[in-house]
């Protein structure tokens, strides 16, 4: 769900510099789509990039989103469901025909996500906050600015992006989907490992991650 900031993080992981993306994208960019991407520069986190380089990254992001509208809508549906659950403590909020459910305790100490397996992910101290300011160079700020300054839910916990320090974590839709997919992959792996062992195939090594 992150845009330019997330794209930069991914590119860095592969040793790709933003300037190289600009060089590859600019000559083949469709004019209207390029101008539309560039028009977002002033109101979005800029991550220290000049407008041309920023626009090149945003152009790629916009193109991917246009090609995958169901995924994009899924981010916002998830974010809306989380907000609805916190706004209506004591009631279930359902997604995907009830395969994923959210429930916020009446005292609002915990928000629970019920997975298809029946396992539960719990988030401490959920509360609704206003969008981050556009001058904050974070994925959360970018996600908020990217969809009409939507509200979001924050919780408390150990933040892997800050070295595991305790603090506030933004539960925007993309992160909730990441949590759900990671947890689902773990459930599939655990079930498969037990099935293999029962069939006479001992498990000697295993790993799981988001596909």
Residue ranges and their predicted role:
Residues 154-156, 162, 180-184, 198:
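Acidic/histidine-rich catalytic cores and adjacent linkers
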Residues 18-20, 188-208:
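Active-site palm subdomain of RNA-directed nucleic acid polymerases
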Residues 169-179, 206-211:
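Glycine- and acidic
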Residues 108-110, 118, 200-201, 207-210:
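Active-site lining segments that contact anionic ligands and/or coordinate catalytic metals
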Residues 1-173:
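Electropositive nucleic-acid-contacting surfaces
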Residues 174-194:
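Conserved pre-motif C helix in the palm subdomain of viral-like polymerases
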């Amino acid at each position: 769900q992150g845009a330019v900031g997330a794209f930069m993080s991914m590119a860095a992981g592969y040793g790709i510099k933003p300037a190289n993306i600009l060089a590859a994208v600019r000559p083949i960019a469709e004019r209207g789509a390029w101008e539309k991407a560039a028009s977002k520069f002033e109101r979005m986190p800029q991550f220290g990039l000049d407008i041309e380089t920023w626009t090149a990254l945003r152009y790629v992001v916009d193109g991917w989103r246009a090609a995958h509208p169901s995924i994009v809508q899924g981010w916002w549906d998830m974010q809306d469901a989380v907000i609805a659950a916190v706004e209506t403590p004591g009631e279930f909020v359902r997604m995907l025909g009830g395969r994923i459910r959210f429930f916020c305790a009446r005292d609002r100490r915990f928000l629970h996500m019920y997975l298809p397996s029946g396992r539960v992910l719990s988030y401490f101290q959920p509360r609704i906050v206003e969008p981050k300011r556009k001058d904050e160079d974070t994925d959360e700020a970018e996600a908020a600015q990217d969809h009409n300054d939507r509200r979001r839910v924050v919780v408390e916990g150990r933040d892997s992006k800050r070295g595991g320090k305790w603090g506030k974590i933004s539960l925007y839709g993309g992160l909730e989907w990441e949590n759900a997919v990671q947890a689902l992959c773990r459930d599939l792996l655990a079930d498969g490992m037990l099935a293999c062992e029962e069939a006479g195939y001992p498990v000697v090594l295993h790993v799981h991650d988001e596909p």
